């Protein structure tokens, strides 16, 4: 099994990011991105990388979803009541989408990988533009460009085992939340939600 995403793929995403950035320049726009993270430190690390990719596309970070042109919801499948809380939060963005039809909303992370979640979003949450599994975070520029150009919804969710593609993307920019610390991944993910197999995902309270 190939572990790493090929460098050609990450270079492709950088090129797409450049195209998006040029589009914003022509339109004289300074779009904003807002991210909401649920779950463990790995999710926080993933969000930093997705924000880094968004900035590479020409977005600037905002702390207010009402001002955002791009909203990233990075979800957790382990924490108690995660699904209920996540969908409750995501539901609040429906009004923002009605007010700004150009707003792009991405549903990312571990919950996106769960069986039935993509179908649930397709059926009940039409204002969500893309469902992005953890293996596709590095494709954020491509996903954004696809939504901008076609306004078609996308579902990038892969099933374990990962046999035909890499699961770790290197050389991805990150927007650090702290000047004094950075996350270092020592493992990636989990394919079993039972308590006995997810102790490594438990964080200090």
What do these predicted ranges mean?
Residues 200-205:
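Short "domain-exit" segments at the C-terminal end of structured domains
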Residues 1-199:
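Proteins enriched for Cys/Gly/acidic motifs involved in redox and nucleic-acid/cofactor modification
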